């Protein structure tokens, strides 16, 4: 039964009513198209409303006159606005609703609202009267909407789809306008204002459902748009584009993390293409790595994206030979202020993240007591579906830049060892020594590590601070003892170290006497130390340290800083200006090879010159002060001196040979990459019991593994050892 059969039993009457409604279709469509051109004028909207009401009345009167009965308006609407023509209906109604939104924006314009920033209005045309007219337009527009929804057109079937399209289009326009007005950046507060404004507008036209139908799509559109420049925002421009990342975070929250998987894969692809290439310096990769940690941690509270993206960077960094040294330098120099703040604020909540990966295996860190107390276990949420096992756990969500950088090492022991070496280098340098900063930074490290792990660093720093106190006492002592020596006492600043706690220094034993002024100063310093520390004595490392010298050549004074081992030879030229190699060897008690190499270094620096006219073994003090180059502490290489065997216990290393078969199988079968670090093997060896009474140290284990590297049985890349697979016959 058709819709007209329900109105009357007369087929002839039904057909006449159908023909009459179809005849009104062209009249309605022509009126809609005509008045749409002038929709910004509310009078034209009134006229269109009148047309719709008149057509509806004519249809009803025709039905009564022809005996059709009481027809259903929806039946007539299907003939005039058929559902199959929905796209055309949406296009025809667009000018009306866009004009309404324009008047709504102008009527609601407030300069202090974020969404209205950047709008340029013609002050001559913008008056309170104009604003009142716009407000009246908004109110008078509703009868037209009601007529569309309930009148002869029954357009309520199309309205939700139409308003959804308009809202999506308006959102895109407003978002792009805000980005252009604020340096291509979409701030979350502005985006929220835009969405709230569109929601209120949908309420104004009594179409609230349309906004809720399309809002998720708008959030997805904005997230996808911002994702196109995600690499620059996250790894390059952070924190400049930080506000756009907050907008992305807001979109993820509103859409239940829709698109996060695709975004993660896209970002990993961008990282592999633009960052993880041979032409990018390790420092720049570390900078981008730290930026990714900070930005992605803020954008995604679950840290799923951060762990996936940073995991790719971390695996690449492990294959770079200079990563270990660059990380410790980056942490303690380039980013020390930011990391200091980060460490102090989050130290209590991330201690568990500092555990070794080996120690974390098999541990359910969701239920660590410390995490329960600090991370709010009562608000526990399950891990996201796209999270790798373990990445959503509280122990991983609490990580920060410091922890993520340290994780590249693979173990805390390696980080502490490298930090100890760097600290020794910086504390023993006279150029950039800063005990106060090192003390403050070490105190922060104590919040992340156990005291026993940093005990060596604590003692080293205490030695330096104590040495500064001795230096001050030495100044007073030198003034009182000046009359006891034939030469003036030159100032000395010494670093008194506890050799057991400091890294092994490259030194040489020499019996050569120091120059008389320097020896006198050393004697006074020794007396000063004995006054402070009874029953102790100093053992001077004569080849370590630097001397600040002032050379006067023909009235031109040149100030330079040179290492002690070279200054000893230079002081000889105060006695006479020309020396032979044999005379220097006899005077200093050094070998001929070492003597010649050090004299050649002085020649290279411009302090002395050879006199080939007299003899190739004759050395003369220079007469050209401009030829003396600038020398900084540590510039000469010690490798030019005589080869010295390392002081290691070879018996202890040989004793580890009995475990080589087990070691080879352990490394080959070690998951996931078939590689281990020396620290891990050290812990394994301790499980078996010490091969000797003292037991192997980490240095012994490292020496044993390096021996296997030299034999071609292992490879070592960035501190990780791997078995070299034997090639089969015919390969």
UniProtKB/Swiss-Prot annotation:
Disruption phenotype: RNAi-mediated knockdown results in defective metaphase to anaphase transition (Mat phenotype) and embryos that arrest at the one-cell stage. Pathway: Protein modification; protein ubiquitination. One of its GO terms (molecular function) is ubiquitin protein ligase binding. GO terms for cellular component: anaphase-promoting complex. Keywords: Cell cycle, Cell division, Developmental protein, Meiosis, Mitosis, Ubl conjugation pathway. The keyword Cell division applies. One of its GO terms (biological process) is cell division. InterPro entries: APC2-like, APC2_C, Cullin_homology, Cullin_homology_sf, Cullin_N, WH-like_DNA-bd_sf. The APC/C is probably composed of at least 12 subunits: apc-2, apc-10, apc-11, cdc-26, emb-1, emb-27, emb-30, mat-1, mat-2, mat-3, such-1 and gfi-3. Belongs to the cullin family. Probable component of the anaphase promoting complex/cyclosome (APC/C), a cell cycle-regulated ubiquitin ligase that controls progression through mitosis and the G1 phase of the cell cycle. The APC/C complex acts by mediating ubiquitination and subsequent degradation of target proteins. Developmental role in early embryogenesis and the metaphase to anaphase transition in meiosis and mitosis. This is Anaphase-promoting complex subunit 2. It comes from Caenorhabditis elegans. The gene is apc-2.
């Amino acid at each position: 039964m058709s819709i007209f059969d329900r109105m009357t039993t007369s087929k002839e009457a039904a057909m006449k009513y159908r023909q009459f409604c179809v005849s009104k279709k062209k009249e309605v469509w022509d009126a809609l198209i005509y008045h749409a051109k002038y929709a910004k004028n509310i009078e034209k909207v009134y006229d269109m409303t009148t047309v719709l009401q008149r057509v509806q009345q004519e249809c009803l009167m025709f039905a009564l006159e022809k005996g059709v009965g009481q027809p259903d308006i929806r039946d007539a609407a299907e003939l005039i606005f058929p559902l199959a023509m929905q796209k055309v209906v949406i296009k025809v109604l667009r000018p009306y609703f866009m004009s309404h939104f324009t008047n709504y924006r102008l009527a609601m314009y407030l300069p202090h609202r974020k969404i209205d920033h950047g709008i340029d209005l013609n002050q001559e045309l913008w008056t309170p009267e104009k604003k009142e007219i716009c407000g009246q337009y908004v109110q008078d527009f509703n009868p037209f909407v009601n007529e569309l929804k309930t009148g002869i057109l029954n357009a309520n079937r199309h309205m939700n789809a139409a308003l959804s399209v308009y809202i999506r289009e308006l959102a895109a326009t407003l978002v792009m306008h805000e980005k252009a007005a604020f340096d291509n950046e979409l701030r979350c507060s502005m985006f929220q204002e835009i969405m709230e404004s569109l929601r209120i507008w949908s309420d104004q036209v009594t179409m609230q459902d349309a906004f809720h139908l399309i809002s998720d799509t708008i959030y997805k559109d904005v997230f996808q748009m911002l994702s196109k420049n995600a690499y620059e925002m996250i790894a390059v421009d952070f924190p400049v584009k930080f506000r756009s990342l907050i907008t992305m975070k807001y979109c993820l929250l509103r859409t239940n993390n829709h698109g996060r998987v695709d975004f993660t894969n896209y970002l990993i692809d961008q990282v592999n293409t633009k960052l993880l290439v041979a032409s990018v310096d390790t420092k720049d990769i570390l900078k981008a790595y730290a930026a990714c940690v900070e930005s992605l941690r803020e954008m995604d509270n679950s840290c799923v994206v951060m762990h996936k993206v940073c995991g790719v960077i971390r695996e690449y960094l492990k294959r770079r030979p200079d990563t270990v040294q660059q990380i410790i330098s980056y942490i303690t120099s380039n980013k020390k202020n930011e990391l200091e703040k980060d460490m102090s604020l989050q130290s209590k909540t991330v201690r568990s993240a500092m555990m070794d990966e080996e120690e974390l295996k098999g541990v359910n860190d969701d239920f660590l007591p410390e995490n329960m107390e600090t991370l709010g276990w009562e608000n526990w949420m399950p891990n996201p579906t796209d999270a790798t096992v373990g990445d959503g756990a509280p122990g991983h969500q609490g990580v920060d830049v410091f922890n993520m950088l340290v994780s590249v090492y693979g173990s805390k022991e390696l980080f502490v060892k490298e930090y100890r070496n760097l600290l020794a280098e910086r504390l023993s340098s006279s150029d950039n020594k800063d005990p106060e900063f090192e003390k403050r930074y070490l105190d922060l490290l104590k919040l992340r590590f156990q005291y026993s792990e940093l005990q060596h660093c604590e003692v080293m720093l205490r030695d330096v601070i104590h040495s500064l106190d001795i230096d001050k006492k030495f100044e007073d002592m030198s003034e009182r003892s000046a009359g006891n020596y034939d030469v003036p006492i030159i100032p000395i600043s010494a670093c008194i170290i506890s050799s057991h706690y400091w890294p092994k220094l490259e030194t040489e034993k020499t019996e050569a006497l120091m120059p008389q002024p320097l020896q006198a100063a050393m004697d006074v310093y020794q007396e000063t130390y004995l006054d402070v520390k009874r029953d102790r004595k100093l053992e001077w490392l004569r080849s370590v340290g630097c001397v600040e010298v002032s050379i006067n050549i023909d009235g031109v004074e040149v100030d330079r800083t040179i290492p002690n081992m070279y200054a000893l030879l230079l002081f000889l030229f105060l006695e006479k200006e020309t020396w032979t190699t044999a005379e220097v060897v006899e005077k200093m008690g050094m070998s001929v090879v070492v003597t010649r190499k050090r004299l050649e270094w002085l020649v290279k620096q411009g302090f002395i010159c050879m006199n080939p006219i007299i003899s190739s073994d004759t050395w003369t003090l220079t007469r050209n002060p401009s030829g003396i180059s600038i020398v900084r502490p540590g510039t000469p290489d010690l490798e030019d001196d005589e080869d010295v065997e390392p002081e290691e216990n070879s018996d202890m290393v040989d004793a580890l040979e009995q475990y080589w078969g087990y070691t080879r199988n352990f490394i080959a079968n070690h998951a996931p990459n078939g590689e281990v670090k020396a620290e891990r093997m050290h812990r394994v060896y301790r499980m078996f019991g010490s091969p000797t009474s003292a037991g192997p140290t980490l240095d012994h284990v490292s020496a044993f593994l390096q021996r296997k590297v030299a034999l071609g049985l292992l490879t070592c890349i960035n501190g990780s050892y791997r078995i070299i697979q034997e090639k089969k016959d015919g390969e």
